[in-house]
Amino acid sequence: DALWPQMQASWPQHFLPLRSASHWAWRYQQRPGVDYHLLLVRQRLTGKPLAALALRLHPGHCDWLDYLGPSQHLPHAIAAARAFAHQHQRPVQALVSDAVASDFCAAQPQGLHSSPSDISIPTNAMDAAGPTASVAPWQGHLWLMGGDSDFM
């Protein structure tokens, strides 16, 4: 669970959905009928966890569904996703929100392509007083990947 607080601290400007160890176990290890591959990127000498990835193989590609870790280890995670996909002779694809797409491209500028999708993310907010203001503070700041949906 050390990676989740590190991730929250390194992206303070974003709203992040829950990515604790218990959530990952529920989301990726306890879902019947779907095989996910969970990778843990470690520091070579100490074995300290740097980042974790959730991947899913398809016949023509490898989906990178989730990332857990601080921003500074994103380049290591990208390299791990590419190495895993290469072993299975597939390209890597990832859905990421616009808020973090530039972070992924900056972490590994060679060979990454970013293109907008037409996916709309409906959000709303309620508190004890009822609906909040029409301008939501998280607009443009949601840290999302494909694994944050129920259909991947």
PLM regions and their residue ranges:
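Amide-forming acyltransferase catalytic core, primarily the GNAT-like/NAT-type
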Residues: 1-66
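Active-site/acyl-donor-binding loops of N-acyltransferases
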Residues: 27, 45, 52-152
